């Protein structure tokens, strides 16, 4: 049996989705030292981070879109990175080339931050991979009540 966590593994603050234990952000919207990037679209990957960690597909796009001189470390899907005792891994999100959901594990607790994802298949080949977790942080383009009429489309 796991002990109850007093603080969330991931939390939102003025810079983005923050993992205090590892001192890293996922898709931060303000300048930070370490950023884990789910994919290269402008609302997720921004200029100004000291160091980025993302997939090689996202890194290619980020360098073209943001700048060749970015400090980017690339990772493969499923490869584990341990920072401050927290294990991070990137898993296919099916959204665009290089897109990933980020799995975060600490002391047996697993959280997943989705970024954008698509469960349908296409020619990119990085098809959505369901990840068992305790907490799932997701985005929703059409999640507001004003979009209820789209449910039957």
Go through the PLM ranges and name each one:
Residues 2-11, 16-19, 25-29, 34, ...:
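His/Asp/Glu-rich metal-coordinating catalytic cores
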Residues 39:
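Conserved G/P- and acidic residue-centered "switch" motifs that form tight phosphate/ATP-binding loops
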């Amino acid at each position: 049996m796991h002990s109850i966590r007093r603080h969330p593994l991931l939390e939102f603050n003025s810079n983005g989705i923050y993992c205090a234990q590892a001192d890293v952000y996922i898709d931060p919207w303000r300048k930070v030292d370490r950023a884990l990037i789910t994919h290269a679209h402008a609302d997720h990957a921004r200029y100004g981070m000291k160091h980025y960690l993302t997939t090689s597909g996202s890194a290619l796009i980020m360098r073209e879109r943001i700048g060749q001189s970015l400090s980017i470390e690339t990772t493969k899907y499923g490869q584990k990175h341990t920072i401050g005792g927290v294990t991070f891994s990137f898993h296919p999100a099916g959204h665009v080339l290089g897109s990933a959901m980020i799995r975060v594990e600490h002391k047996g607790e697993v959280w997943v931050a989705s970024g954008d994802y698509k469960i349908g298949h296409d020619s990119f080949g990085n098809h959505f991979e369901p990840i068992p977790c305790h907490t799932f942080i997701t985005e929703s383009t059409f999640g507001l009540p004003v979009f209820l009429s789209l449910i039957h489309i």
